[in-house]
């Protein structure tokens, strides 16, 4: 079976660069026997950033890049020359990426906009050269500071798709067929449950060159919030959708009951989904006459807009687009929506075994027994660097 290209979570090890060592050097020139200290400062270690990129839709490009490290700052040198700063590392991620600590599952940050840049790890500051420690009583200081150590962290990047409309329904409810009709997306379509095994995105064209994004996720079954079926892994993608389109086939024994089951599964997974606007589409309605449609309308859930559609014949598709656009653009609909990301249980995620990796040791690695803090415990040092 071919490996899926849809990767919505990865685990990576990140390390910033350590600061370069300050130089302990004295000016030595002919006819200047006491030139004094002229050791330069060490360079700053490289930072590690996350940056949103709308050209990425999955985390596939990071699946096999498990170690991301910025470079170290270079040491200072004579003539008060500062060392070169370490090179930053920027991790490009799709918009909607959420970052968690791989050990505790604690939420760290999220990236939702194209070009948004978030610092994940800060590079170490460069150490001060001995020139900075020259005083009236100490004209020839022989000590300098080592650079600050690097920071390291293993994180989990988890993608939650950003879409205007999310399709919610049982397997074989016609979600993929609808997406293929209203957009240029070509999801796999077949007459059996769980045809869709991964989310699909499509851009729906509307009047006057306007458009909105629609997301199709694998079908939800009763008990999905408890881990049954495929729904649990993909339910998180619904959290980012502005509007939920519930899809129930007209052939269902009880349309209202099926809608309530779907609704309850979402609420069990995340009660905050109750606040999202909802629209109901009764699919596969091409065999219904007006009298039967009128009868079924009497038993539908109250307080939710609905429309009868058929993706095969095109019945109600225009009306559905109008309804979705209307709901998406209602007054106050796009007020700032604050999404609270809960911590995750990292034990529920499966990762391939990490390959053993030996990190390179720098030739100028500091003595491990050297106490770093003793050089940075004075606020005066910080003031000297400004």
Curated annotation (Swiss-Prot):
InterPro entries: G_OBG, GTP-bd, GTP-bd_Obg/CgtA, GTP1-OBG_CS, GTP1_OBG_dom, GTP1_OBG_dom_sf, OBG_GTPase, P-loop_NTPase. Residues 163-329 form the OBG-type G domain. Mg(2+) binds at residues 176, 196. GO terms for cellular component: cytoplasm. Gene3D superfamilies: GTP1/OBG domain, P-loop containing nucleotide triphosphate hydrolases. It comes from the Bacteria. SUPFAM superfamilies: Obg GTP-binding protein N-terminal domain, P-loop containing nucleoside triphosphate hydrolases. The keyword ATP-binding does not apply. An essential GTPase which binds GTP, GDP and possibly (p)ppGpp with moderate affinity, with high nucleotide exchange rates and a fairly low GTP hydrolysis rate. Plays a role in control of the cell cycle, stress response, ribosome biogenesis and in those bacteria that undergo differentiation, in morphogenesis control. This is GTPase Obg. It comes from Parabacteroides distasonis (strain ATCC 8503 / DSM 20701 / CIP 104284 / JCM 5825 / NCTC 11152). The lineage of its organism: Bacteria, Pseudomonadati, Bacteroidota, Bacteroidia, Bacteroidales. The gene is obg.
């Amino acid at each position: 079976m071919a490996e899926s290209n849809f990767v919505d979570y990865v685990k990576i090890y990140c390390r910033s660069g350590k600061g370069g060592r300050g130089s302990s050097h004295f000016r030595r020139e002919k006819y200047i026997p006491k030139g004094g200290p002229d050791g330069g400062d060490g360079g700053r270690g490289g930072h590690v950033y996350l940056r949103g990129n709308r050209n990425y839709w999955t985390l596939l490009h990071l699946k096999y890049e498990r170690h991301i490290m910025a470079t170290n700052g270079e040491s200072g040198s004579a003539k008060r020359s500062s060392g070169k700063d370490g090179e930053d590392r920027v991790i490009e991620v799709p918009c909607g990426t959420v970052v968690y600590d791989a050990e505790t599952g604690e939420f760290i940050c999220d990236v939702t906009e194209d070009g948004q840049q978030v610092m994940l790890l800060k590079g170490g500051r460069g150490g001060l050269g001995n020139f900075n420690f020259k005083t009236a009583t100490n004209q020839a200081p022989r000590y300098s500071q080592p650079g600050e150590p690097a920071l390291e962290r293993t994180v989990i990047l988890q993608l939650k798709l950003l879409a205007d409309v999310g399709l919610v329904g049982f397997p074989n409810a016609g979600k993929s067929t609808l997406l293929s009709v209203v957009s240029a997306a070509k999801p796999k379509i077949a007459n059996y449950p769980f045809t869709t095994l991964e989310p699909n995105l499509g851009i729906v064209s509307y009047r006057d060159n306007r458009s909105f994004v629609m997301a199709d996720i694998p079908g939800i079954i009763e008990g999905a919030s408890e881990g049954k079926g495929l729904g649990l892994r993909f339910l998180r993608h619904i959290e980012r959708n502005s509007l939920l389109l519930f899809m129930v086939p007209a052939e269902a024994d009880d349309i209202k009951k099926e809608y309530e089951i779907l609704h309850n599964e979402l609420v069990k997974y995340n009660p905050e989904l109750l606040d999202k606007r909802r629209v109901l589409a009764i699919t596969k309605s091409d065999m219904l006459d007006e009298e039967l449609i009128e009868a079924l309308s009497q038993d539908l859930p109250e307080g939710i807009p609905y429309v009868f559609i058929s993706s095969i014949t095109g019945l109600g598709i225009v009306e559905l687009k109008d309804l979705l656009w209307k709901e998406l653009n209602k007054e106050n609909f796009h007020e700032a929506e604050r999404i609270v990301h809960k911590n995750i249980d990292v034990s529920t995620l499966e990762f391939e075994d990490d390959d053993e990796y030996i990190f390179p040791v720098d030739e100028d690695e500091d003595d491990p027994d050297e106490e770093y803090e003793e050089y940075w415990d004075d606020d005066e040092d910080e003031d000297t660097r400004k």
